From Swiss-Prot:
InterPro entries: NTF2-like_dom_sf, UPF0225, YchJ-like_M
Record-stated family: Belongs to the UPF0225 family.
Source organism per UniProt: Bordetella bronchiseptica (strain ATCC BAA-588 / NCTC 13252 / RB50) (Alcaligenes bronchisepticus)
Name recorded for this polypeptide: UPF0225 protein BB3385
Domain of life: Bacteria
Amino acid sequence: MKKHPSSPAACPCGKPRAYPDCCGRWHAGALFLQAPDAESLMRSRYSAFVLDQLDYLLQTWHPDTRPSELEPNAADVKWLGLQIKASQQQDDTHATVEFVARLRQAGRATRLHELSRFVKEEQRWYYVDGDIR
């Protein structure tokens, strides 16, 4: 089920901008799927996870590694924040982003620490895969 923040709430990605002016512009509208760099795509994907925007997640996942489907968040999942540890562009079409995403599920806090790989094809950035840290 797609969720959108009500009113101009802060973007889930943690940047000090309203969602429509931050990740929301990559999720819908004229700039749909047009994140300009790997870090912006990473932030927009985190926001999409928070908001259960599964179609966006699938469309920004590289076709070679994309799962056939994704499950929405369990009812007891609450995303708590995103921290970008490092963002590095190797060349014009390859980049990595290291991040820590914090969440709580069934009352238990957990962290996902990943080094993600991204590739740019036909003027679009895609998530390829990542190594859990």
